[in-house]
Design a protein with these regions (language model features):
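N-terminal nicking endonuclease/strand-transfer module with a His-rich metal-binding environment
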Residues: 1-133, 137-140
Length: 140
């Protein structure tokens, strides 16, 4: 995708991956995915609401933090960023649109990272920054 900026890194086992998950899920500017009815109201108003999403319908931040903290191999981190005008032009200016993109390409990403698709795990959060909307993604 033209104009896409990628930054990559990793967190070693025992290196605080759960804290990183909490940071990307709860920092200022994170967008909550729309959910229907009373459940959305519950999500938006409950303590520790977050914008974490994954391939499942709901991402549980506490369970995610426990899972990545107990993971014994590196957790890979990615930031994908676009300029505001490119995000608007391409339609990647919401958490839902980024989630659809990641869902469409998760098998390719698993293959590229040499992770069996059945074992591939990922979580992400969309940060709607003024000049560069972006996602933070964790993969293991």
């Amino acid at each position: 995708m033209q104009g896409l900026i990628q930054k990559s890194g990793y967190i070693k086992s025992g290196g605080g991956a759960g804290g990183y998950a909490e940071y990307i899920a709860t920092r200022d500017g994170v967008e909550l995915l729309n959910r229907s009815g009373q459940y959305m109201e519950y999500i938006a108003e409950r303590p520790r609401s977050h914008g974490l999403f994954t391939n499942a319908e709901y991402a549980d931040l506490e369970k995610t933090m426990e899972e990545v903290n107990s993971h014994t191999a590196p957790v890979w981190t990615f930031i994908y960023s676009l300029r505001r005008e490119d995000a608007a032009r391409l339609g990647y200016d919401s958490a839902a649109s980024w989630r659809r993109l990641l869902l469409a390409h998760q098998a390719e990403l698993a293959e590229a990272m040499k992770i069996p698709p059945s074992q591939f795990r990922w979580y992400a959060a969309f940060h709607d920054e003024k000049h560069h909307p972006h996602i933070h993604m964790m993969v293991w």
